[in-house]
Amino acid sequence: MRIILLGAPGAGKGTQAQFIMQQYGIPQISTGDMLRAAVKAGTPLGLEAKKVMDAGQLVSDELIIGLVKERIAQDDCVKGFLLDGFPRTIPQADAMAANGIEIDHVIEIDVPDEEIVKRMSGRRVHSGSGRVYHVVFNPPKVEGKDDVTGEDLSIRPDDEESTVRKRLDIYHEQTKPLVEYYGNVAAQGKTQYNKFDGTQSVAAVSEQLAKVIG
């Protein structure tokens, strides 16, 4: 079961990724975690990546693909894997195909931009404990105050509306073209592509996912 999960930041990919991992017993592979693990393990590719990152440069697609191949050859990927946050661009998707990395399911969690802005910019955090609230979906008892300590809540820089909109712009520019790309791959019978309405409840999306993946 080799799965790619697509969707904008805040679409609920993380929640569904947890469900897929538990349901099917496959690991979630994020490029960030993979890079850190390879660097820590001191593999040849990990050392090469460390050199690039220490110089403040971006790790090349070629190197990332090498790390992906190395990672999916490990024992815990025997049943499959879930790729999260990769590929992000069409050249990366092409490179995966060229390296013989086949994908069974491409899953897109689709949520309109305005809904994502509402979800993310409404988050409030108590920095001392990490407790998270939401002004609409999970408000504190007293506006702007932590329920337990009564201390002020804050907005994380990542959740500022302007930051959320910038991240959405990058997603539409870089990653949205992958939707069309994998739609074409699916039309050729080389993978299955399914889009889910991420504005539904978490349970409803999980149930639909399970039906499609089988």
Curated annotation (Swiss-Prot):
Belongs to the adenylate kinase family. Its EC number is 2.7.4.3. The gene is adk. Consists of three domains, a large central CORE domain and two small peripheral domains, NMPbind and LID, which undergo movements during catalysis. The LID domain closes over the site of phosphoryl transfer upon ATP binding. Assembling and dissambling the active center during each catalytic cycle provides an effective means to prevent ATP hydrolysis. Pathway: Purine metabolism; AMP biosynthesis via salvage pathway; AMP from ADP: step 1/1. This is Adenylate kinase. Signal peptide: none annotated. SUPFAM superfamilies: P-loop containing nucleoside triphosphate hydrolases. AMP binds at residues 31, 36, 57-59, 85-88, 92, 156, 167. GO terms for molecular function: adenylate kinase activity; ATP binding. Residues 30-59 are annotated as: NMP. ATP binds at residues 10-15, 123, 132-133, 200.
